[in-house]
C-alpha cells in the first residue's frame, strides 16, 4: 500500500458515511494526484462543509496544506488552528511539545505513527497544530504518520461507540437504526440509478422504501417490523445491477 493510499484510508475512516464522504474522497484523490492545486479554494470549500466535526475539518485542512503546493506567505486558516489547539488544554500542549521533539528525530512514516500512537488524541491534535502554525517543522512523511495515528485513535473510539449501539438490546434503538440504514440505502440507490431508462424500477423501489420508513415513523410501529428492510433493498439493488450488466459483491 502506498503512503498516500494509507493516509487516504485513515482520514476517510473518521468521516461519517454519506454523499459528503464520497465528495471528500474525490478531493483527496485529486489532491494526491496533483490535480487540485488551488489550496485557497480547497480550504474555503472545506470550511463550509456541513456535518463534519471541527476536528475532522482540522485534520483534513492539515492534510490539504501538507499536500497542495502553496505560496510561502499564504495565511493559515483560523478554523484549522482552532480545531488543532487540543481544546486549549495546557496538558495537551505540554505532551504535544514532547511528542514534537521525538518526531523531529524521526524520518519515516511508520516510525512516526508508532511513536504517536502512545499519545492521546488531544495531544496529537495539538502537535499537528504546532506544525500547522509553523512553530515546528517535520518531514511530510512524519507529519502524515502523525495524521494517521490521530485518525486511528478517533476511529477506535468511534468503533467502540458504534459497537455499543449495534450490540444494544434496546428494541427501540435497534428499530430506529434499521430504519435509518434502510432510508440511507434507498437514498444511495436513487443516486446510483441516475438517469438511465432502466433506472425507473430501482428509483421506484427506493422511493417506496423511503415512504414506508416515513409512514412507520409517523404511526409508530412494532420494533420488529423493520427487520430485514435494508437487506430487501440491497437485494433489489443487486438485481437491478445484474440487469445493467454490473456484477458486484454484496454490500453487507
From Swiss-Prot:
<dbReference type="GO" id="GO:0055036">
    <property type="term" value="C:virion membrane"/>
</dbReference>
<dbReference type="GO" id="GO:0042025">
    <property type="term" value="C:host cell nucleus"/>
</dbReference>
<dbReference type="Pfam" id="PF00598">
    <property type="entry name" value="Flu_M1"/>
</dbReference>
<dbReference type="InterPro" id="IPR001561">
    <property type="entry name" value="Flu_matrix_M1_N"/>
</dbReference>
<keyword id="KW-0946">Virion</keyword>
<keyword id="KW-1048">Host nucleus</keyword>
<dbReference type="GO" id="GO:0039660">
    <property type="term" value="F:structural constituent of virion"/>
</dbReference>
<keyword id="KW-0468">Viral matrix protein</keyword>
<feature type="region of interest" description="Membrane-binding">
    <location>
        <begin position="1"/>
        <end position="164"/>
    </location>
</feature>
<comment type="function">
    <text>Determines the virion's shape: spherical or filamentous. Clinical isolates of influenza are characterized by the presence of significant proportion of filamentous virions, whereas after multiple passage on eggs or cell culture, virions have only spherical morphology. Filamentous virions are thought to be important to infect neighboring cells, and spherical virions more suited to spread through aerosol between hosts organisms.</text>
</comment>
<dbReference type="InterPro" id="IPR013188">
    <property type="entry name" value="Flu_matrix_M1_C"/>
</dbReference>
<keyword id="KW-0694">RNA-binding</keyword>
<comment type="function">
    <text>Plays critical roles in virus replication, from virus entry and uncoating to assembly and budding of the virus particle. M1 binding to ribonucleocapsids (RNPs) in nucleus seems to inhibit viral transcription. Interaction of viral NEP with M1-RNP is thought to promote nuclear export of the complex, which is targeted to the virion assembly site at the apical plasma membrane in polarized epithelial cells. Interactions with NA and HA may bring M1, a non-raft-associated protein, into lipid rafts. Forms a continuous shell on the inner side of the lipid bilayer in virion, where it binds the RNP.</text>
</comment>
<comment type="similarity">
    <text>Belongs to the influenza viruses Matrix protein M1 family.</text>
</comment>
<dbReference type="InterPro" id="IPR036039">
    <property type="entry name" value="Flu_matrix_M1"/>
</dbReference>
<dbReference type="GO" id="GO:0046761">
    <property type="term" value="P:viral budding from plasma membrane"/>
</dbReference>
<dbReference type="GO" id="GO:0016020">
    <property type="term" value="C:membrane"/>
</dbReference>
<dbReference type="InterPro" id="IPR015799">
    <property type="entry name" value="Flu_matrix_M1_N_sub2"/>
</dbReference>
<dbReference type="GO" id="GO:0003723">
    <property type="term" value="F:RNA binding"/>
</dbReference>
<feature type="region of interest" description="RNP-binding">
    <location>
        <begin position="165"/>
        <end position="252"/>
    </location>
</feature>
<comment type="subunit">
    <text>Homodimer and homomultimer. Interacts with NEP. Binds ribonucleocapsid by both interacting with genomic RNA and NP protein. May interact with HA and NA. Cannot bind NP without genomic RNA.</text>
</comment>
<dbReference type="InterPro" id="IPR037533">
    <property type="entry name" value="INFV_M1"/>
</dbReference>
<protein>
    <recommendedName>
        <fullName>Matrix protein 1</fullName>
    </recommendedName>
</protein>
<dbReference type="Pfam" id="PF08289">
    <property type="entry name" value="Flu_M1_C"/>
</dbReference>
<feature type="short sequence motif" description="Nuclear localization signal">
    <location>
        <begin position="101"/>
        <end position="105"/>
    </location>
</feature>
<dbReference type="InterPro" id="IPR015423">
    <property type="entry name" value="Flu_matrix_M1_N_sub1"/>
</dbReference>
<keyword id="KW-0472">Membrane</keyword>
Amino acid at each position: 500500500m502506498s503512503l498516500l493510499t494509507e493516509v487516504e484510508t485513515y482520514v476517510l475512516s473518521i468521516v461519517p458515511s454519506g454523499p459528503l464522504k464520497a465528495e471528500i474522497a474525490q478531493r483527496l484523490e485529486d489532491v494526491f494526484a496533483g490535480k487540485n492545486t488551488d489550496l485557497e479554494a480547497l480550504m474555503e470549500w472545506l470550511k463550509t462543509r456541513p456535518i463534519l466535526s471541527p476536528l475532522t475539518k482540522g485534520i483534513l485542512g492539515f492534510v490539504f496544506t501538507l499536500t497542495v503546493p502553496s505560496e510561502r506567505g499564504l495565511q493559515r486558516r483560523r478554523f484549522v488552528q482552532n480545531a488543532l489547539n487540543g481544546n486549549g488544554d495546557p496538558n495537551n500542549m505540554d505532551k504535544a511539545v514532547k511528542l514534537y521533539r521525538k518526531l523531529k528525530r524521526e524520518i519515516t512514516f511508520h516510525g512516526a505513527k508508532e511513536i504517536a500512537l502512545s499519545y492521546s488524541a488531544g495531544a496529537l491534535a495539538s502537535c499537528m497544530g504546532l506544525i500547522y502554525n509553523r512553530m515546528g517543522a517535520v518531514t511530510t512523511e512524519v507529519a502524515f504518520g502523525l495524521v494517521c495515528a490521530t485518525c486511528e485513535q478517533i476511529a477506535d473510539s468511534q468503533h467502540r461507540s458504534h459497537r455499543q449501539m449495534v450490540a444494544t438490546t434496546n428494541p427501540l434503538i435497534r428499530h430506529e437504526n434499521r430504519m435509518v440504514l434502510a432510508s440511507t440505502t434507498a437514498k444511495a440507490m436513487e443516486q446510483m440509478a441516475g438517469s438511465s431508462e432502466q433506472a425507473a424500477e430501482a428509483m421506484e423501489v427506493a422511493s417506496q422504501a423511503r415512504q414506508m420508513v416515513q409512514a412507520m415513523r409517523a404511526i409508530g410501529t412494532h420494533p420488529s417490523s423493520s427487520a430485514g428492510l435494508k437487506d430487501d433493498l440491497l437485494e433489489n439493488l443487486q438485481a437491478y445491477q445484474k440487469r445493467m450488466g454490473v456484477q458486484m459483491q454484496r454490500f453487507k
